[in-house]
Amino acid sequence: MRQVERHWIKEGHYLYPICDDLTFKAKNLYNAGLYQIRQSIFERNKCQEEEKPSVLSWTELVSQFRKEKQGDMLALPSKVSTNILKILGFSINSYYQLLKGFHDKSNPSVTNKPRFPRYLHKTEGRYVVEFTNQTFSKKRGSNGELILCPKDLKLPIPTKVEDPQCVRIVPKLNAFVIEVIYNVEVSLLKHTGTYAAIDLGVDNLASSTFSDGVNPLLVKGTKIKSINQGYNRLIAKAKSKLPANQKTSQGIHRLWRNRELKLQSELHKVTSFLSLYFDEMSIEKVFIGKNQGWKQEVTLGKKINQTFTQIPFTTFISQLIYKCLARGIEVVEQEESYTSKASFVDQDEIPTYGKGNEKFAFSGKRVSRGMYRTKNGFLLNADVNGSYNILVKGLLALGKSLDREKASFHTRSLKNWQFVANKDLLLQYM
């Protein structure tokens, strides 16, 4: 399994001008390569013969540029420039794959028509630079730095990773992110027969239920909401002061960057806690609810929609997946349509959206903020009801069933965000 160590390089850092220069040269090579590929596509479309010429591949592009001694390619180390054109080639292939999926009406995975890769801005554009382990020096720097391209650049990268596989310089919001990618060993998957499910939301960021009767655990999302709302106000205020013909500024980029870093920090705390918690509970598999296009089609009201779409749930899921996998726990993304509407207590059938049953009738309903009422008038937490239904769906996909008699509805809430994922604190929630 691969993990990433990230270093944010802001203006004023000694590596900033080097990163800026490399990504600028990478942009020039990207634009030059894209131009050649576009020309080959135009020639193919103009051709009237039955056997049309093929679109220029990235390998052919590398050979052509080397033969011509193309200036943008010579401006970068050979292996680095090759990787840039390779990434461009993969982007072109991805475009055609997505376009094929968009025109395939039987495949609903691609809902919006993809756009062909575009040229980057001549002066402001920057592009990703990737260094494989073939460009690393065998010797480290005086302070343990990883040395990239020792013959050409001699670029020192501060890292604690002993055996990195790849290094990327990614331009992001007027800054650069140096990503050091490395491999980690994965623990053997558990086979305990105990399962958990997570329902993601706004007020309750993660509502966890369990198959063995353990009380549900609610991780509150109040701090995430507070961060979003605070930065939304600051960004709106900054935008109101911009000239009419200006869309953004360095100050706004700085606000977006700080917002992302704070959200990343909070999500890391939560996912670290949950992965340790599931490990201590001997959970074999975790089902986490997610629907295709859920952020594009959400209809929860204007204010809640804004908060829901701004919370990086995909980041949360990816963090939880690799942290649980490191502990031998598998995380499965489970389709969750109708799980919030169906009554878990009344054992309602939970259909799948888009199979002709959109008008399905359910025994209970949501009656107030955060509460669900069953057919017999029993009130329970609405997110707990949804989480249990996700658990039912997940187990059904495995050919198993949930013992509903063991289900507990007495929730425990995790409100303190200043926690560290350790076993001493964990005992308070078990």
Question: Residue locations for each model-derived region?
Answer:
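Nucleic-acid substrate recognition interfaces
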Residues: 1-430
